[in-house]
C-alpha cells in the first residue's frame, strides 16, 4: 500500500531515501524537535547532526506504508531497512506540522 502524504512529508521521505540532508532539513522549522531512540534533537543544527549520524550509522531507506492525518498531526507507519539488526522493521513517525513545515517528529516502534 502506498501512503498518501502531505507534500512536505513526501518530500522529506524522498530526501531521506536520497540521503540528501539539505533537502531533509528543509522540511523542518528552525526550532523543530526530533525525538528518536530516547533523545531529543532541538533546532535545525541538532537535527542536521542527528540526520548525518543516523545515515552514516544505519545507511537506511524508508518506505511509508500508511498514514493518517488529524489537523496538524500526521502519523505515518513506515518500513525501515538498513544496516541494523532485525532489518527491516516497522516504525511509526508522528509529525506535528506548522504550516508547510515539520515542527516535531517522534519516531517509535
Language-model region placement:
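A short gly/proline-enriched turn/hairpin at secondary-structure junctions
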Residues: 32-42
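Short beta-strand edge/turn micro-motifs at domain boundaries
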Residues: 90-109
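Short, low-complexity N-terminal intrinsically disordered segments enriched in polar/charged residues
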Residues: 1-26
